[in-house]
Amino acid sequence: MNDLSDVETRLDVLPASPRGAPVPWWAKIAAKVVLARALPSYGSRKAFGLFLHGNLDHNVEQHRAFVNNVLAQHARYGGAPARAILELGPGNSLGTALFAAARGVTRTWLSDVGDFATGDMALYRAIAGSLDAELAARVDLTDRATMLASLNATYLTTGTASLAAIPDGSLDLILSTAVLEHVRRAEFAHLAAEMHRMLRGGGTAYHEVDLMDHLGGALNNLRFSEAVWESPFLADSGFYTNRLRCREIVAALQAAGFEAAVTRIARWPALPTPRRALAAPFRDLPEEELRIANFGVLLRKP
């Protein structure tokens, strides 16, 4: 079993180009505040292509590669292949249950804050058809519920509270992509403690974290005071991130009892939002910290 101190952080430079529609950040906030109230259900939002919870239902190969890479990483740092796993925030696709089963996982949990995953069985049939023939033959693809049951997989949809259903020390691996930044700031320490509770000794977790604002891929979310940003008016409008920076997230995970190693960091070549526009305390942070757009962190429970 490799030591986390052996992990070398890969450093990348992110292109400075914005993401999303070419609309000013403040106009996006105004539109999202209105639309979040006009379209309260996820189904209606998804029909209009709004407030989507990921796009892995359209990026099957990207999804497969992520799951396979995380399982391989666990084998190196967790001491044994993963048999029981949890994905936090599966979003639009429950394909992780299929990809993991193909790699020997026998118990899968998937947890989200709502029921966002597609029930379109064409996606899952396509995934199953690309996997080992024996696995494909035993997966029941009648509907989403029977598929999950045939994979010994459980889909939880009430957020952190639903993690209480997972027994202490029962997991080998926890994984997520662009999830930790969406956990409410006041709930982050509790989620970290829950992850520590659920993992066995020697178990690992891997999280990809996106620190860009969800308004165009800059730092416009750091323009607001904590009182304004954390208010329900903005926090419930579909673009909330907790604004914890890389150093704070890693420190919170270590405080929960984890060993931690940052596996990669992608930085902007320069600040995408002027420092003078940022609210306190963000405007006083070191530039190297503010320029981190996204990163990966590997955890292990001693």
What are these regions (language model features)?
Residues 230-247:
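Acceptor-substrate binding/catalytic loop of class I
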Residues 95-162:
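Class I SAM-dependent methyltransferase SAM/SAH-binding core
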Residues 161-174:
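A short acidic, Gly/Pro-enriched loop at the edge of an enzyme's catalytic core
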Residues 172-186:
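A short SAM/SAH-binding and catalytic strip from SAM-dependent methyltransferases
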Residues 81-92, 204-229:
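Conserved class I S-adenosyl-L-methionine
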Residues 251-254, 260-302:
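A C-terminal cap/extension of S-adenosyl-L-methionine-dependent methyltransferases
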Residues 189-201:
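A short glycine-rich, Lys/Arg-flanked "PGG" loop and its adjoining helix->strand segment in the class I
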